[in-house]
Regions:
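PLP-dependent aminotransferase-like
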Residues: 69-158, 165
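Phosphate-binding glycine-rich loop
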Residues: 31-78, 91-96, 101-104
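Short beta-strand segments
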Residues: 5-7, 58, 131
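Solvent-exposed, non-membrane alpha-helical residues enriched in polar/charged side chains
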Residues: 20, 24, 42-46, 66-69, ...
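N-terminal "arm"/small-domain region of PLP-dependent enzymes with the aminotransferase-like
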Residues: 1-31, 36
Length: 167
């Protein structure tokens, strides 16, 4: 018997009518790029997260790349990333011209291992990009302390943990 890796049809079928009706409504509304639907999403998602603001972007890769660009990350820089993550994490670093430096995960959480972060820091390291996986936040107290001790930026990727709470 073949077991599918990921059955998106099964996940989609129970909510297909609702999703398709919303897509059709938005498509028929006209201004769906930077329009009222985006503003509605940003407000609702910020409320869900308990955040004062939210910026809706095309995808997580764009969000990570913009964050790294805002930090001034570029050629010659290194960014510490989890070895266990979606490819967008590494691509965002590469698209800025920097080098992703992989760190293995902790066996108990599958999130980036702070001890591995310490070992991976070089004179070219500019940032740490932890990814909160499977709804489980990374050890941010330790990661923030490491970053502060080495004067590094931290850019958190929460694309796989929407709504998760740390502590």
């Amino acid at each position: 018997m073949k077991v599918p890796f990921l059955n998106l049809e099964a996940a989609h079928s129970s909510i297909a009518a609702e999703i398709e009706a919303e897509l059709l409504r938005v498509a028929r509304s006209g201004p769906y790029v930077l329009g009222p639907e985006l503003e509605r999403f940003e407000t609702a998602f910020a409320d869900y997260l308990g955040a004062p603001h939210c910026a809706g972007l095309a995808n997580g890769l764009d969000a990570l790349r913009l964050g790294l660009m805002a930090m001034g990350i570029g050629p010659g820089d290194e960014v510490i990333v989890p070895a266990n993550t979606y490819i967008a994490t590494w691509l965002a670093v590469s698209q800025c011209g920097a080098t992703p430096v992989p760190v293995e995960p902790r066996e108990d959480t599958y999130n980036i291992d702070p001890d591995g972060i310490r070992a991976a820091i070089t004179e070219r390291t500019r940032a740490i990009l932890p990814v909160h996986l499977y709804g489980q936040p990374a050890d941010m107290d330790t990661i923030e302390a490491i970053a502060e001790a080495h004067d590094l930026w931290v850019l958190e990727d929460g694309a796989q943990a929407h709504g998760a709470r740390y502590k």
